[in-house]
Regions:
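Oxyanion-hole/transition-state-stabilizing segment in secreted/luminal serine hydrolases
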Residues: 1-2, 28
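Well-ordered, non-membrane alpha-helical segments in soluble/globular domains
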Residues: 3-7, 43-44
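Surface-exposed amphipathic alpha-helices with a cationic face
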Residues: 7-15
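A short helix->loop->beta-strand "cap" motif at the edges of active sites that frequently abuts
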Residues: 17-20
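Structural beta-sheet core signal
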Residues: 23-24
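Catalytic His-Asp segment of secreted/periplasmic serine-dependent ester chemistry enzymes
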Residues: 27-104
Length: 104
């Protein structure tokens, strides 16, 4: 997959220079005009890579924070106004999910 290959390239180059790389998962986007099932499959694959590869120095799971548990391809209604972008409450939840120790 080109996205994961791109991540691996960036990770290797950055870490070779002593730069920490923090991965952040991709949030749901089913209501976007460009949504496709293939895109969702890719999003899930990228998120699995970010969460489980061990290649990042840390991970922030924005997907887990904002997704609707009853419909995981959607952002929780309380966290969005357009079903695609987080609103202030969504961004607040995302910010609160960041472990600042990742940056030390």
């Amino acid at each position: 997959d080109k996205i994961i290959s791109g991540y691996r390239n960036i990770i290797a180059r950055a870490q070779a220079k002593g730069i920490k790389i923090i991965g952040a998962t991709l949030t749901p986007f089913e209501e976007a005009v460009y949504y496709s099932e293939e895109g969702e499959v890719q999003r899930q694959a990228v998120n699995r890579f970010i969460r489980n590869s061990g290649e990042f120095d840390g991970v922030i799971d924005f997907d887990a924070v904002v997704r609707d548990p009853s419909n995981p391809k959607h952002i929780l209604p309380a966290y969005t106004e357009d079903n695609l972008h987080p609103n202030n409450a969504g961004y607040k939840a995302m910010a609160e999910a960041i472990d600042l120790n990742l940056f030390r």
